[in-house]
Amino acid sequence: MSKSKIPQVLTIAGSDSGGGAGIQADLKTFQERDVFGMSVITAITAQNTTGVQGVHPVPIEMVKQQWTSVLSDFNVAAIKTGMLVNGEYMKAVAEVYKEVASIPLVIDPVMIAKGGHPLMEKSAVSVMREILAPLAMVITPNIPEAEALADMSISSKEDMVKAAERLQEKGCRNIVIKGGHAVDESHADDLLMLENGEQIWLRSERIDTKETHGTGCTFAACIAAELGKGHSVEESVRTAKKFIQAAIRSHLGIGHGHGPTNHWAYRKEHE
């Protein structure tokens, strides 16, 4: 095992050939938050800012082998999951995670790419809800993902609270429902429902841009990085909110579609 005191954080997700989301976004975020990042790749995708052209899942046994390889040599301080393809991958992740359940787990329940391409089989939603999500310290669904997981429609802040309560009834601990898909045109209100039932609303100005590829990955990765450094759930989520807002504000103008965010913007703003 490594003896370094540098926080070491693991991401389990798909590879984005365009570099804006998935493993690539996670590792950039880890670097910016001063933690050492490792990765387990669940799928190789051919994608760019205009969409996903192909998905090639990595064999489940290879996913397990990558994970056990990392765990055998590194002091993993936090784990973040992203694209997990289907229920069998989720069950495999849950199986291995139960052996290291003291490590904080952040789940980004990735279901659909920014361009609309499905990244999770519909049949896997129940596996995510019943088996994997209850293992997480934090789960970070957007509105459509929260609707699928809570099996209800969300059209108001009251609905967001109700969805979070439903997820807690299923065993989820701390839930962040991201309000970026909500109807409020001026603000994005995220709900952090702590495991003790406390509701914390995090409001930010809505930024008028389509340069939002990888925002969900980046947000969850930042939470994992902060948890890996020993911060509380609330502190970690608040930092991640500031980090992603800076990244969206200072987008890079790369590509011809939904471009990536600027992962070094938060650091530049605070230099």
Regions found by a protein language model. Give the residues of each.
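Conserved N-terminal subdomain of the carbohydrate kinase-like
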Residues: 2-11, 31-115
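Charged C-terminal helix
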Residues: 6, 57, 234-271
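N-terminal phosphate-binding or glycine-rich loops at protein starts, especially the Walker A/P-loop
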Residues: 8-32, 237
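Short pre-catalytic strand/loop immediately N-terminal to key active-site residues, enriched for Gly-Thr
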Residues: 12-18, 199-213
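Short, small-residue alpha-helix embedded
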Residues: 24, 147-148, 209-233
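Phosphate-handling active-site elements
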Residues: 33-38, 198-200, 226-240
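Conserved phosphate/ATP/ADP-binding segment of small-molecule kinases
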Residues: 122-199
